[in-house]
Amino acid sequence: MSEQNNTEMSFQIQRIYTKDISFEAPNAPQVFQKEWEPEVKLDLDTASSQLADDVYEVVLRVTVTATVGEDSAFLCEVQQAGIFSVGGIDGTQMAHCLGAYCPNILFPYARECITSLVARGTFPQLNLAPVNFDALFMNYLQQSEGAAQQQDA
């Protein structure tokens, strides 16, 4: 038997934690005087690093910016991180695990932090919709392949 046949896929969450958190309301209290019809922008980013054999840190950065007219109402950024044990996979499967599966686990924690911070800033409730990290990962792969093909041309 080859060594590959003896290797089973394993996945375990070791820890989930808030790595960095920031909330700014640069135009308070004036922004509270305005009619609340915000334009809300959501930015997502992920990063991963190997800590040890089969142990990875994945960081999901979620930034929410709300503007009312020309004024910034609030800027909220959360870096939600997790330490994961992942074994028995490599290549595209590992990239998918670290780039989509783990961020999908982290997002509800980041969403709760953002919702809490916005409420503590006394702004109306902010409900962030679930994110399809699998679709975002597939889009990233397609863009990467397109960029590689353009460089080869």
UniProtKB/Swiss-Prot annotation:
Compartments, record wording: Cytoplasm
Family named by the database record: Belongs to the SecB family.
HAMAP family: SecB
Annotated organism of origin: Erwinia tasmaniensis (strain DSM 17950 / CFBP 7177 / CIP 109463 / NCPPB 4357 / Et1/99)
Biological processes, Gene Ontology terms: protein folding; protein tetramerization; protein transport
UniProt entry tagged with the keyword ATP-binding: no
Source species, domain of life: Bacteria
NCBIfam families in the record: PRK05751.1-1 (NF004390), PRK05751.1-4 (NF004393), secB (TIGR00809)
Name recorded for this polypeptide: Protein-export protein SecB
Cellular-component GO terms for this entry: cytoplasm
Oligomeric form and interacting partners: Homotetramer, a dimer of dimers. One homotetramer interacts with 1 SecA dimer.
GO molecular function, one term: unfolded protein binding
Record keywords, A-Z: Chaperone, Cytoplasm, Protein transport, Translocation, Transport
Function: One of the proteins required for the normal export of preproteins out of the cell cytoplasm. It is a molecular chaperone that binds to a subset of precursor proteins, maintaining them in a translocation-competent state. It also specifically binds to its receptor SecA.
Gene assigned in the entry: secB
Cited PANTHER family: PROTEIN-EXPORT PROTEIN SECB (PTHR36918:SF1), PTHR36918
